[in-house]
Amino acid sequence: MESGRPRVLYVSDLAYQARGRRYCDEDIYLTARLRGRFDLAICHPLDARALMHGFDAVVVRNSGPVLHYRDEYDAFRSAATETGVRVFTELTGNGDMAGKQYLLDLYAQGHPVIPTVDRLEDVGRLPDTDVYVAKPKFGADSAGLVVVARGDLPGLDFTDLLVQPRIDFEYEVSFYFIDHEFQYALYAPRPQQRWELETYQPDTDDLAFAQRFIDWNSVEHGIQRVDACRARDGALLLVELEDLNPYLSLDRVDPATRDRFVEALTAALLRLVARP
């Protein structure tokens, strides 16, 4: 019997093993809450393309690094775009959803981003340091990330690879948004324990920093996370704009913040479903 409620396909890899966190717990919690307003089914990311046409919206959440299933993800994107399937987060993003080319582009344009290059001959444009970080353009969750000495850079295969100086920072901080609205912020006050997150109270400058990247991105409907580091001189530098499947660390916020987030997510999904 039809309920008349919007039908949502929630995409998650419940078995994905993340370092220091259990992503599946977050999706179990969110789907339990969303069922109050939607007819909802959960599926693995490799099944999303086959199932998505029976739903009013597809919510992509903790679906694991695309690096592990690039061809299948590209096929899902193409099919969803061609047939007009509503996807949350929208597939128009220019952040991690499209790879990490945006880090190169934003750095070249003078935005406050960790200096980034993708060619050995451009390493001289980076701040001088003895240690660098190399990571895949289509990586996520630190997959494929390696730390290399300056003298070892010529031995790297720069195909789809980014290189950055290893930054000496005070702490990492993340700002969480639904559509273009700020929800909460968390930070890791101890850099060696980056998964031990605590509530962060951003000031006006912090919020302006995060909002500039949300406004730059081509996403109207979806969840985005702006990851930054606080340099020793006090400046914030963008680490990542995660607009594909950002982990939300909802277990690290207080119940009232968690409730407000669920309410905002519900409202955003209803807006997406109502879109012509």
Locations of the language-model features?
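ATP-binding N-terminal substructure of ATP-dependent carboxylate-amine bond-forming enzymes
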Residues: 1-86
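Flexible loop residues that form catalytic
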Residues: 13, 63, 121, 137, ...
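Short secondary-structure junctions
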Residues: 36, 109-112, 128, 158, ...
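Short amphipathic alpha-helix with an adjacent loop that forms part of the alpha/beta core around
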Residues: 47-54, 78, 123-128, 152-155
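A short beta-strand motif that forms the metal-chelation/ATP-contact edge
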Residues: 55-60, 135, 175-177, 184, ...
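A conserved helix-loop-beta module that forms one wall/lid of the active-site cleft
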Residues: 74-149
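Phosphate-binding site of ATP-dependent enzymes
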Residues: 141-237
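C-terminal active-site "lid" helix and adjoining low-complexity regulatory extension at the edge
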Residues: 230-276
